[in-house]
A protein has these predicted regions:
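Short acidic/polar active-site loop segments enriched in Thr and Asp
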Residues: 75, 135, 159
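Short amphipathic alpha-helix that is part of the acyltransferase structural core
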Residues: 22-57
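Conserved acetyl-CoA-binding loop-helix of GNAT-fold acetyltransferases
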Residues: 104-107, 113-128, 151-155
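Acyl-donor-binding surface of acyltransferase catalytic domains
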Residues: 1-29, 34
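Conserved beta-strand-loop-alpha-helix junction that forms the acyl-donor binding cleft
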Residues: 112, 138-149, 166-168
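Conserved catalytic-core motifs of GNAT/GCN5-like acyltransferases
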Residues: 5-10, 140, 159-168
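A conserved beta-strand-loop-helix scaffold within acyl/acetyltransferase catalytic domains
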Residues: 60, 69-76, 80-99, 103-106
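Conserved GNAT acetyl-CoA-binding A-motif
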Residues: 129-141
Length: 168
């Protein structure tokens, strides 16, 4: 049985276009995961993606996770509330194209509906532009993602540049 899924591709071409959300009442921090730790990437991929049909990496071997997470193009950032792991994002830097892909971004379910998604996305966009090479940050989201995902991208200043319908 196939399912019809709407996919939107969005981009932002200047950090000046970011409509940032950095007003939080929770004690939280976002930090670059150093050193790389494939177990953290795998943990978030599974726990965040479970409700949103993220399946492409479920069959990855440990060596595939290690290879991916240790790739110099990939940067993983972790959101903590107090000391709890609350969310993450993965950025892939394509310096030869002067662009960054927000490959994955999401929150652990306990931290939904607290404005943390907009805070996390604001951080992802800002960190994408810190290298003075990036001219474009892009992401894709689909109708299986969190119900507020597309609206969050649009509210942060991203623009849709492509739409498609796929069958999965």
């Amino acid at each position: 049985m196939t399912q019809r899924v709407e996919r939107n591709y969005l981009e932002i071409t200047s950090v000046k276009d970011l409509k940032e959300n950095n007003l939080l009442t929770l004690n939280c921090s976002i930090t670059l995961l150093e050193p790389e730790n494939f177990q953290i990437n795998k943990f978030f991929y599974k726990i965040v993606g479970k409700k949103h049909n993220w399946t492409d990496r479920l069959s990855w071997s440990e060596s595939q996770w290690i290879q991916y997470s240790s790739d110099e193009k990939v940067k993983t950032y972790i959101l903590k509330v107090e000391e709890d792991l609350a969310g993450y994002y993965e950025l892939i830097f394509y310096n030869e194209k002067s662009e960054v892909e927000i490959a994955y971004l999401g929150l652990v379910e306990n931290y939904h509906n607290q404005k943390l998604g907009s805070y996390l996305l604001s951080s992802a966009i800002k960190n994408s532009f810190t290298n003075n090479i990036t001219k474009r940050v892009w992401v894709h989201t689909c109708s299986l993602d969190h119900k507020n995902a597309l609206n969050n991208y649009l509210k942060r200043g991203m623009k849709i540049f492509k739409k498609e319908v796929i069958e999965i």
